[in-house]
Amino acid sequence: MSKDMLVNEGIRAREVRLIGANGDQIGVKSKAEALDMARNVNLDLVCVAPNAKPPVCRIMDYGKYRYEQQKKDKEARKKQKTINVKEVRLSPTIEDHDFNTKLRNARKFLSKGDKVKAAIRFRGRAITHSEIGRNVLERLAKECEDIAIVEAKPKMEGRSMFLVLAPKTDK
């Protein structure tokens, strides 16, 4: 809902389609008549569909309505999760212990719900043996296949090769 809804005198239309406080349709009334009806029950006249012909207005407690909307928006923001991409750097000639350390880090990131970008940087003549780097990345993907899916297969970009792993979702 928009934060600046038309309320009471802010409504510019001469005639409005009126909905009562309990949700029943009252019909097309003049703005003055609708405002009087709202004031008689100590509520506000709020335009809920200003683009309709005639605009649809509802009799409600605007302060309470705005508070409820803010609460809903806050809950929705709470439920949203930001996905971070963590990077793990490897080398094509990585030793087993170093590989296991990088693997442990990647698994930790994946278990927290983050994506992992595994990168291998080729230095000097190592670029001619890019298949060694590809094997290292595929090994990492295979070791993580129980908790992750491969989002982007190993691919070369300049002197680096990348692989992106995303955590498996429970759906």
UniProtKB/Swiss-Prot annotation:
Keywords: Cytoplasm, Initiation factor, Protein biosynthesis. SUPFAM superfamilies: Translation initiation factor IF3, C-terminal domain, Translation initiation factor IF3, N-terminal domain. It is found in: Cytoplasm. The keyword Heme does not apply. It holds the Pfam family IF3_C. GO terms for molecular function: ribosome binding; translation initiation factor activity. Its main location: cytoplasm. GO terms for biological process: ribosome disassembly. GO terms for cellular component: cytosol; membrane. It comes from the Bacteria. Belongs to the IF-3 family. IF-3 binds to the 30S ribosomal subunit and shifts the equilibrium between 70S ribosomes and their 50S and 30S subunits in favor of the free subunits, thus enhancing the availability of 30S subunits on which protein synthesis initiation begins. Monomer. NCBIfam families: infC. This is Translation initiation factor IF-3. The lineage of its organism: Bacteria, Bacillati, Bacillota, Bacilli, Bacillales. The gene is infC.
